[in-house]
Amino acid sequence: MCSIGEDDFGDTGGLHAMTAGGPVQIATGGTGECQKCGQHSDDLFKVNFRSEECRDCFLNYARHKFRAALGAAKALPRDSDVLLLLDGSIESIVLLDMLHYAQTQNTFKRLHCQAKVLYLDESVVQEQQSLDIDRLQKLQDRYTPFDLFVIELGTDLSNLRPLKNYTPKTSREESDLKIKLDKLRTLSARQDYLQQQRKRFLASVAHQLNCTHVFVPSISKDLATQFLTSIALGRGGSAALDVALCDDRLDHDIKLLRPLKDLNEQEVQLYVRARNLEDLKLGPSLATYGQEKGETASLQNLTAAFVRNLQENYAATVSTVFRTGNKIAPNRHVDQDMCQQCQSPLDSLLSDTLLAIEYSRVVSLEGSKLSNHNNDLEQLSMQRLNKDDRLCHACRNVQDEYL
């Protein structure tokens, strides 16, 4: 079975890379002999911890990571119906290019699945100009015969349209999703709530299009950030699924797959150069939601800044962080109920830590009134913990942020 060696990522304990250095450099290319195939090349590609190689050898290496991620875990059954998320990021275009290449190979090497592409118009949340249909049409023309669908985030599924039948709205009413976001007091709560709603919306669209799997373009840097963010937000019990290849918590038994999880930022940029891909800047992406408010505006922004600093100075550490998440088993029990918001296992009955957190919160809010009544403090703590037993700890915190 196809697999990926740890040496591909420079993770031999991380010891060889644990010295501070400058920002990751993207080589501009040069001429010489490919160290992989021995052929002369006018445009060499240099990935950290690998020898210089020609364009074809580099593309084989990058595409191997994509295929190996899916093949090693047998995560994608043969002839599955797949929905690929195109979110406007360059990573999503790389994922589209890799999937198209895998679909157009001969029978032996072909990735046997039926793929559709979804562009999720997120401008309704970002309050920015809607997408450029002409640019999206160029993308569909390049990646024929994939069917491309478009829908605005948070709208009714009846608005799902093939690209040829889609017309951007010149004026729009404020969506229910935007109204709910505006009622949340903190940016951390808004970003967390938006991420959960986006996953549920993707599952609904996939179900509407009769797809059983969803491809998302998360790379190692994104997953390292997500892993640390999940822990900081109180989602430690489900953090492993937030960074795993396969997340099976979605509605309608839809499985969310991250086939680019083993690619880093440098490899993505080199792949863009090798394939002459263009960042079409299709529209705003949720990856940038709230970033304009600064690094300290939310836990998510602060964590992303921390991981970027690691990427610049300790390149191999980012891979180590998200691989740590892969080694953590999800906290699941057969008879355990699931959170109605994020579909993670409910954790309120499994940990005394949550009771201690609520106790501290009650002391802060009611301590001056109940200083001589410890039993009352404990009772209030239990009431807060059980006031909505359908939500996990993190989603309950989001609910507490509503104005």
Swiss-Prot record:
Its main location: cytoplasm. Pathway: tRNA modification; 5-methoxycarbonylmethyl-2-thiouridine-tRNA biosynthesis. It comes from the Eukaryota. Coiled coil: none annotated. The keyword Signal does not apply. SUPFAM superfamilies: Adenine nucleotide alpha hydrolases-like. One of its GO terms (molecular function) is nucleotidyltransferase activity. One of its GO terms (biological process) is tRNA wobble position uridine thiolation. One of its GO terms (cellular component) is cytosol. It is found in: Cytoplasm. Disulfide bonds: none annotated. Plays a central role in 2-thiolation of mcm(5)S(2)U at tRNA wobble positions of tRNA(Lys), tRNA(Glu) and tRNA(Gln). May act by forming a heterodimer with NCS6/CTU1 that ligates sulfur from thiocarboxylated URM1 onto the uridine of tRNAs at wobble position. Belongs to the CTU2/NCS2 family. This is Cytoplasmic tRNA 2-thiolation protein 2. It comes from Drosophila willistoni.
